[in-house]
Amino acid sequence: MAKQIVFNEEARRALERGVNALAESVRVTLGPKGRNVVLDKKFGAPLITNDGVTIAREIELEDPFENMGAQLVKEVATKTNDVAGDGTTTATVLAQAIIREGLKNVAAGANPMGIKRGIEKAVESVVEDIKTNAKPIESKESIAQVASISAGDDNIGVLISDAMEKVGKDGVITVEEAKGMTTELKVVEGMQFDRGYLSAYMITDTDKMEAILNDPYILITDKKIGAIADILPVLEKVVQAGRQLLIIAEDIEGEALATLILNKLRGTFTCVAVKAPGFGDRRKAMLEDIAILTGGTVITEDLGLKLENTTIDMLGRARQIRVTKEETTIVEGSGSQDDIKSRVEAIKKQIDETTSDFDREKLQERLAKLAGGVAVIQVGAATEVEMKEKKLRIEDALAATRAAVEEGIVAGGGCALVDAAKALDSLKLTGDEKTGVAIVCRALEEPLRQIANNAGFEGSIVVEKVRNGGRGVGFNALTEAYEDMIAAGIVDPAKVTRSALQNAASIAAMLLTTECLVSDIPSKDNGAAAMAGMGGMGGMGGMM
């Protein structure tokens, strides 16, 4: 297919127009007084949001060269979202500022490669300053502050800090849509997996339709159990001990299942059977997790163990087990804390090494189930449109909170970036590299400038006042006052601020060094074909 090619200034200007189209759509959402953007959806109601990456993902431009610029800045937002989970609007604003200032200098005759080197050195210096001045996050109040600033809602901040307190920093916190109007937190203690009882005859509480086993033994195997003879020896030992039993197996069917139900109905013996969670290798790993948590052994031929030779000390134990139609929860397993700790460390290592997002998510779920539990934030709202908008804000706040726990917090409201610009004074560079540093220095003011503009203030005046104030003193757009940002609870995660700058500078520096754009020539056949079709319809009308 034939291509169209543009060079030099024409190419860079086309990219800049695309960058501006996307960035202008996103930057209006920045800060506590930022506005929302409405995104049209082909199916269902439009989506109202102030989430930078969600807006960026929707933008496609008609002109192929302008679209290249928009897609490059979209990469800044998505990469920041992947790494830090928040700060996507800040990253977009920074990228636009670096590109705008950089292109001015390139047009004036500066060497783009020299500017690129200067930008890289400046970013390195600023990132070092952010890391040095980051404060570790310890208290529940600090966690609530980070979440509140990200979500723009104090109630959400409290909800997330409660969730983190209950399940720990390694715990899983999921966000779901609720059926009612209230947003609430539900915490699942212990290990839960999505497999329920194999027969309703196994329930012990008919009102709640669930089976509750107190201080039971747990038989864990990866085999199918069909014949009662396979498990009879261990059943007899459990009955003699006067205890209840939970069986977790690949499947239990036929004679074995019928016998267990019959004994339950006669009141001889209480046993609940559930299928093993997961599939394939993941199932084996989850069964091992359950065994370690409960102090049992997985009866598997991989270890040379057979069901008929199972002894009572191979069974796991727990304080209580709750089994519903859909899920099983093991509360307070009797496993050794040292074994659980070792298993947690092994899973953490796997999380660091894996390259698959899906595997990482599943490993984090396993880690949470071993380390603390799972918290579910159920998002309620009056309408579906409001619920989706709220859910996006909570997901961002959650990501920001995790980032804060990881690398600490810095002054919020764009203040940390303005303060970090002072670190650039120590860089003694010359020529175009010095210009690159000046470009970054100007770009670092842009988030604060935009927050002030969105709040109805003159950005340049606000930036000047903050620059001349002490470190950590910034502009609170909500109260319209200048104050110590950390003391006022206006904080950003250091990881979010750092990632936003690094990703913005990376894409912007590459874009400045662009000299040529190549794209397919847009096809004109589609319009001609449509016109021909219309003519045919007219001919048919004459025949009627």
From Swiss-Prot:
List of residues binding ATP: T29, L30, G31, P32, D86, G87, T88, T89, T90, G413, N476, A477, L478, D492
Reactions this protein catalyses: ATP + H2O + a folded polypeptide = ADP + phosphate + an unfolded polypeptide
Domain of life according to the entry: Bacteria
Keywords attached to this entry: ATP-binding, Chaperone, Cytoplasm, Isomerase, Nucleotide-binding
Catalytic class of the enzyme: isomerase
The UniProt record lists the keyword Nucleotide-binding: yes
Subcellular location: Cytoplasm
Single GO cellular component term: cytoplasm
A single BP term in Gene Ontology: protein refolding
KW Cytoplasm (keyword) present: yes
Record Gene3D superfamilies: GroEL (3.50.7.10), GroEL-like equatorial domain (1.10.560.10), TCP-1-like chaperonin intermediate domain (3.30.260.10)
GO molecular function: ATP binding; ATP-dependent protein folding chaperone; isomerase activity; unfolded protein binding
The enzyme's E.C. designation: 5.6.1.7
Subunit structure: Forms a cylinder of 14 subunits composed of two heptameric rings stacked back-to-back. Interacts with the co-chaperonin GroES.
Function: Together with its co-chaperonin GroES, plays an essential role in assisting protein folding. The GroEL-GroES system forms a nano-cage that allows encapsulation of the non-native substrate proteins and provides a physical environment optimized to promote and accelerate protein folding.
Record-linked NCBIfam families: GroEL, PRK00013.1, PRK12849.1, PRK12850.1, PRK12851.1
Name of the protein: Chaperonin GroEL
